[in-house]
Structures are given as C-alpha cells and as structure tokens.
C-alpha cells in the first residue's frame, strides 16, 4: 500500500484533473481491482466510529481538526449561519521520502502524538481525496468497460445466433444442392436419351426420304407406263373402230337394202311350209327361233321402239315351246340328230325379220347360211366361253352344265307370271333373262349338232376351197357368198389378229 501511494505521489502534479464522466446509473458501491466491492458510506462511517491511532507507518490515522467557535451576532440569529470562507492552502510538493515527511509532520508543534491526532494535515487530506477520486475514476472506467463488454457480448450473441441460422441455411442449401445435383443427373440422362431418340428419328427421316425418292421415281416410271398404255389404248381403240366400221360395212352389204321401218314383225308361217321344213331340216326351226331372239335382243339393247304385244307374243311362243316338253329322240340313222336330247320337236312359230333395218341387227347372219359355213367361218358363232355381249349377257344358271338343264328346272321355265313377280303385267327384264339363258344352250346345241352332222372330209374340202379363194382374191373385203346363202368372206373373218367372234366376245 505504501509503495502504491508513493507511486501515486510521484506522479501527482498541481494541474487540474479532467472531469470524471460518471454514468447516470452510478451507485455508491464501486468494483475494485480484486473484484471486491466497497461501499463508501459504510467505509466513512467505520472510519469515524473507530479511529486507528496506531503508530504504524503504513496506516496513518487521519488528523482531526477542531473548528473554531464563531460568535453569533444578534441580527443574524434568525437566519442561517454560513461557514466562514477561509483561503485555500496551496498543496506543497512533498518530500521524496514519505516516512520523513510524516515524521516532520509529527515532530511539528501542532502534530498529534502517539494516540491522539487532533489535527490532520491538509496535504494528507487532499491525498486521500485524490485517492478517492482515482478510485472513482477506476470504478467508472471499469463500469464503462463492463457496459462495453455487455454490448460486445450482446453483439456476440447476435452474431452467434446469425451464425446458427447461417449454419442451418447452409445445411438446408446443402440438401437442396444434393437434390438439384440428383435432378441434374436425371436431366443429363434424359438429355442423352433424347439425343439418342433424335438420332434415331433422323435416321428414320433419312430412310423415309430415301423411300420417298424411290416412290417418286416409281411414280414417274408408272406415269410413263401409264402414258404408254394410254397411247397403246388409243391405238387399240382406233384399230377397234376401224374393224368395227369394216364389220358394219360387211353387215350392210349382206343386209337386204329394201328393209322397212324399224319394227319387229312376228308373223305366223304357213303350217304346210313348217311341216316340210321340219321333215327336211329339223334344226332349221330352232335356228330361226335363235336368230329371231338375237335380233329381238339387239333391238331391245339398241333402245328401239318394239311393241309390247309383239314381245309378249314372242315370249308366249317360247313358253309354249318349253311347256310342251316334247323331247323325243330321233332315229340313230338320221344325219341331223342333235347332240342334246332337249331339242323341242313341237310346232315352232317362225319369225319374219325381213323388215328389220340394218341398224337394229348389226350382228345378223342368215339362218340358211349357218349350215354351209366352213370351219373358219364357223368361228363367228359365239361359243360358251366367249358369248356375244349383245346376245348372251345373262348369267349362267347353276344347273346349266347338267345333262338336261331344261328337265332339271321345269318349274323355272313354266311358272306363270303371277307366281314369278306377283304383278298383273309381264316383267320384260325377267323374261329376257330367261330367254337369254335358254338361248345360250340352244346356240351351243346347234353348234355341236353342226359339227357332228358335217363329216371331216367335207369340212376339210370346205377349208381348202376357202383357203384357195383367200389366196386367189386380194386381202380386201369382197363379202361374196361362199355357198347358196350369204356369209362373211374369210378376209373379214380373219383379218390380221382380229376376228368377228373376238370382237363380239369383247
């Protein structure tokens, strides 16, 4: 304590000290350097009550001063008495040795003795006050430092909180980063797959473009082929028209020029002539009926005006011929025995077609000329495989190739019109279908009959005669009669690769 006091005294000077900044919340207790608190009031009370009069040089006792008594005046008795103003003593500079200074003070006439110190030196009192002031400054500084420390602690706590929040944000962002990295990996995989698909689609597009190019080239080639086929078709049409004109010219030459207006007249022939023809040529009546049906079919298809009474009459004749069902086999020695046994031997109504114009019968061939045709000229008769479109356009019945189709379907041919369509008038379309179906096997029968009746020798001689005539004559249409009846010339029948039968079949 003495050393500290000496150090303080050495640093002491007479300069005025700076004012002490005391905070507002300053209390009477001060914090010391050794963390011990001192209450100034208690300390001063203890010092007053118990004085230390020991001769210790380390703890000098304070000097007690006695105040001089003052006389009270009469006029100031009622008022408050103020202390006298005494001049302040200047603080003299102390000696270097504190103990010597104390001894000087004690050896002075007014200094206190061992246990009684009536008066205290002003310098010592000032020193104590200075120590007190220094303690106060020290405590104030400590208080300020504590205040600053508290602020710094608060800031540290806030910073710690922010740090904790930042660490939590960091962890959260880390998890988000992990998730985003996973998403990035997935997106990279998808990108790789999409690139693969894009490459595949590009390859497909290239292949499709190649196919398109091939199809375009194929389309061009097909277009060229189509143009060539169209040109060839036009040439064939021109050729067909030429042959059709030639065919029509031949037909006009063979037709009777004295034909009357376009009417199909069906007349009943004389019975005596019919019996003579039947006795001489049994197939002639059937051929005449076939030719009449041909002409009638052509007239219907060319949309000429045909009276319904004549048509009904012809249908009636055909139905009577079928309904009689007279199929008597002829003698084996007879030359004109038919191939099929369904040839009707009943009375057949003949047809007079002399007044039919050439436009209504372009495919007309005389019935008398069909017996004397050669093998080449006989090809003009339509066969079963290639029927004529103007004559044999009806479909074949289901039982057509039976042994006897008429006998297998008697009800189909003999049924009445009321049972067939339930109407009061004739159905021309159904009647014509039946006529065409019946006409189909009639023509085949006549053709087979003619092949059987004509001997091979006669057919060969006829073929040779026709070939000689063809070589002798030019390759132009003469259409001269081959026999007693009118017929087509071989040039018209076999001109280049085109024949009349082929034309009719088309």
UniProtKB/Swiss-Prot annotation:
UniProt GO BP: mitotic spindle pole body organization
Polar residues composition-biased segments: 50-59, 94-119, 330-353, 361-389
Main location as per UniProt: cytoplasm
UniProt entry keywords in alphabetical sequence: Cytoplasm, Cytoskeleton
Compositionally biased spans, kind Basic and acidic residues: 38-48, 63-72, 412-422, 461-470
Taxonomy, superkingdom: Eukaryota
Region (Disordered) location: 18-121, 252-276, 329-429, 447-470
Cellular compartments per GO CC: cytoplasm; mitotic spindle pole body
UniProt keyword Membrane, yes or no: no
Record localization: Cytoplasm, Cytoskeleton, Microtubule organizing center, Spindle pole body
Protein function: Plays a role in mitotic spindle pole body organization, possibly at the point of spindle pole body separation. Required for mitotic exit.
Protein name, entry field: Spindle pole body protein CSA6
Organism: Candida tropicalis (strain ATCC MYA-3404 / T1) (Yeast)
